[in-house]
Regions:
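Beta-propeller blade termini
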Residues: 76-86, 132-145
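Acidic, small-residue rich beta-repeat scaffolds with periodic aromatic anchors
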Residues: 22-56, 135-190
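Acidic/hydrophobic-patterned starts of short beta strands in beta-sheet-rich repeat architectures
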Residues: 88-98, 142-147
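Flexible low-complexity loop/turn motifs enriched in small/helix-breaking residues
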Residues: 19-82, 86, 91, 115
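Short consensus segments that form the blades of beta-propeller domains
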Residues: 72, 100-105, 155-161
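C-terminal motif of bacterial Sec signal peptides marking the signal peptidase cleavage site
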Residues: 14-17
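Sec-dependent signal peptide recognition
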Residues: 2-9
Length: 190
């Protein structure tokens, strides 16, 4: 009898310590693939994959402290936005322009694309340039195009950008990533 009581006591302690009375299930295992929130209708609260890191905006911005610095790493969505069905699934996708200012002299511009559908494209941004001047963004012939002014490699960043460039984003044949290209009139885009 004492043995049964001892075993039941140990079992009760074990179940209590291990949460045996809980009805919650264990969290599902995850892999190392980054999760990018892809809601084309709400780019102000979406994730953008830049340089191997997913930055998720909240109300169009994200501000993070920089280690060993008094400045912040700031991401901000600009007013430039276009919609179109780049992945041909019957639902519009969205392209936006966002900037990254890490407190130095540069302001880095990116084209970000948010796709609809069950399989979002993780690498959804491309670098456009540093201290450029965005003119507009549109959806043309199944591709997103962003028009901006930039400088050639010989021109100082102190001078305003004057060379018009059209950045082009299109979905690859497998519909798993974007191909980015550009065109201009002076040979910057090769």
């Amino acid at each position: 009898m004492k043995t049964k009581l001892a075993i039941l006591s140990v079992a009760a302690l074990f179940l209590t310590a291990c949460g045996g009375g809980s009805t919650e299930s264990a969290p599902e295992a995850t892999n190392d693939v980054p999760v990018v929130i892809q809601n084309p209708a709400d780019p102000a609260n979406a994730g953008f994959y830049i340089d191997g890191i997913v930055y998720t905006l909240v109300n169009g911005a994200l501000e993070q402290p920089i280690e060993d610095s008094e400045t912040n790493n700031v991401f901000k969505l600009l007013e430039f936005k276009s919609s179109g069905d780049i992945n041909a699934d019957g639902t519009d996708d969205t392209a936006v322009v966002l900037i990254n200012d890490a407190g130095g002299s540069g302001t880095f511009y990116y084209l970000g694309i948010l796709t609809s559908g069950p399989a979002p494209i993780i690498e959804n941004t491309t670098f456009l340039g540093d201290r450029i001047d965005i003119k507009g963004i549109s959806f043309v012939d199944g591709k997103f195009e962003v028009v901006y002014l930039d400088r050639d490699s010989e021109t100082s960043f102190d001078a305003p950008p004057t060379i018009e460039i059209t950045g082009i984003a299109e979905l690859d044949e497998s519909k798993t990533s974007f191909n980015f290209s550009c065109r201009d009139n002076v040979g910057i885009c090769l």
